[in-house]
Amino acid sequence: MEITTKSSTTTDDLNNNNNKTVTPIKSENSATGHTSPPNNSTTTTTSSTSAQPITVLPTEIIKTFEHLLRKSQRLFIGLRDLPQFGRQWQPFFQKTFELYTKLWKFQQQYRSILEDKSKYGLKRCEIGEIASKIGQLYYHYYLRTSDTNYLNESYIFYEAIRLRSYFKDVSLDKTPDMMVKQLRYYARFIVVCLLLNKKKVVFDLIEELLKHVNDYTKIYKPSDAQEWSLVLQEIFSFLQADQCATFSDTNQSPSLTNSGNIINNNSNSNNNNGEHTNNTVQSHRLNHLNCPSPPFPLESTQILQQAILVGSQQNQIKFSEITLDMFRMTQSLEYEPMSEAKENDMKLKQQLTALQQQQQQQAAEAKEKNNGTDQQNTTIPSQPLQQHLHHQQQQQQNGNGSGIKKRNPHKYLLYRPTISQILLFLSYSFKELGDNKAMLLYICADGFTNEDNHVNQHIQPPPSIQQETVPSLIDDSNTNIPITTTATATNPLYNKLFTKGLTLNMQKPSQAINSPTVNNNNNNTTTNVTVPTTTTTATNVTAQTTTTTTTTNSTSTSTTSNIPIYKYNEAPFNTKVESLYPMDLLPFCRKPFFLIVNSQSSDIFNELPTFNQPFVSLLSPQSIPKKLVSNLKCGNLFTFFLHDPISAFCDISCGNKIPSKTFNNISLLAQNSLEIISKLLFECVDLHPSFSFFLLDDFLRSFIIRFIFCHATFYLHKEFQDNIYQVKSNPPLPKSLLYNQSILKSIHQLVSELDVSDQFLGLNENRLVIHEN
């Protein structure tokens, strides 16, 4: 489908170069309907096969428009009931896209008649509402397909609504419902801009949203005023936590670094020292600059197909059911658009040229001053980066570069789900996996430990019946069945896998009424997850089965009333029914499985028995040093390292306010460190086959490399000299790799550049013994 629009020359235009044909985005298993951006001018669209325009009566136009509007609204509402998994939702989305395309073209063609107050009186805010729903359609299609092209399309519509001021006169019309729709539009637009790293637009939108919220509460004094204040507070907290890098420089603004695209925002200010402060944002989508490629002749293979991101932690920074950690993992699981990647490539080459000139000048001055003294410790090792760029150019010439479009893995974002919802999405993701494809589960949740007496009550029956045999409750015969619980009670693996777990969203407060540690406020939180309609049938079947079982047990109990029967379901352990245990994941390990856990109970996944399939788990520290807890306002530290190792390194050592020149230098040093780790991984002969399998995938390789970088940083940092502060993996990585001198020296180069040697141990300095599992 192709739609041609005429663009006016007024200030309402989306872009000055918008006089072109809008080509629909083609994607596999995607809707083909593509709608052009809103246009302020009255546009008449005619088919190329029509020789003359067809005259239509105004009454017929109004009747057709109302019919299309009602039908589109009905279809739009119906999309909420579609499950997020499977493929049955695709034809419904395609039908909705096509109808909204028809509706938008129709109102463009007959805009003058529809806006005539004597005929219909279509308001500009109503046009904006239609455009807002089209943008929302694209956004939800992005969530279901992980294709960032649809996210860009959503941004185009949302931006056009703002530039053409479709909601400008909402406050004058004094229609509270339309004002609420305007506020929701701003909230959705902010989410889209956050996902696209358009922070400059975000700051502008926040100012406008704050003004509109104040107007809304002042005029109508609504009951939901506090809810909108909470929305603003969440946005402010989210942006403050996501402000990864702040530069202080007197002469120059930050340049593009190899970590991603640096974008200046409007939050520039001058401090008391006269330094110019630039708050910047980095794009952390994957590209060949922040993820080293496999060595020749190996090539990257798309192994990761399904990803489930779970955020279920208390007091986590979030906005619109997306926590900061989920947001960062989402960014890390998407490829950077090719145009931006090429731009970063060119900028990096310019940086390398400038650094080489600087090094030559410094070397000449040092040689003249020190009579030829070796100054290798003060130079930037840019040679590996040059080799990397040369390798990338060869790959592109061979057709392995930009000529092949790589797909993002399909993602499910689950905010505070129940255990049944997690298992449901794991099952459908497992079902969709192809041959030699992998599934990733990232879960950030609080951990818990059952008390020893609770565990004993759960495992062992009362002492009065431990050594007895009880008659069978299945039939009326006198067959005796011995109770064998000794093996369960003394099984260390059972105690390891079931005495700890991860707390999820508690949906039934009655189950946790005896637990003093449960926060019942969690029950008010809703999860953006749709349960399939088959649940009703399953519930009915379960109810019938329960009734039958109760009758049978009642009959049998009357004949054996003298036998004490222990009711296991009344044990205090049942208060943790809404929890995730390691054994819950075992059935899904029949196919390649990649697990990332960020929790103080992450160690329980360190001994998970698996099938003969590739399996890797990256586990966070069990605790964070007390001196760093108060400074961690940027989300969970382990996830921060997997997302942006450079900013995370700065966060635990020197803070995030550093000169831009220093940040450019440490970015290149960190890139060199990641290159070293990548090279050692592929050269390691003792590497577990599971790691070797996952290393060929770009996303999983980047997580493994950043995990080793995180391990080396914690290993050398003075505050992390305890086993509970160390990251772990299952299967364990070889010690020859984790403690390789080349990796540790590259970390020390970063330490020297940041001048934080007092916080790190030397390479030959004694450290506490860290026990590796």
From Swiss-Prot:
Keyword hit for Cytoplasm: yes
Region of interest (Disordered), ranges: 1-51, 250-280, 353-408, 513-532
Similarity section: Belongs to the SCAI family.
Protein localization: Nucleus; Cytoplasm
Gene Ontology BP annotations: DNA-templated transcription
GO MF term list: transcription corepressor activity
Reported function: May function as a transcriptional cofactor with a repressor activity.
InterPro entries membership: SCAI (IPR022709)
Comp. bias regions, Low complexity: 1-23, 35-50, 258-274, 353-364, 383-397, 514-532
Name under which the protein is recorded: Protein SCAI homolog
GO cellular component: cytoplasm; nucleus
Cystine residue pairs: none
Primary site of residence: nucleus
Keywords: Cytoplasm, Nucleus, Repressor, Transcription, Transcription regulation
Biased composition (Polar residues): 24-34, 372-382
Taxonomic lineage: Eukaryota, Amoebozoa, Evosea, Eumycetozoa, Dictyostelia
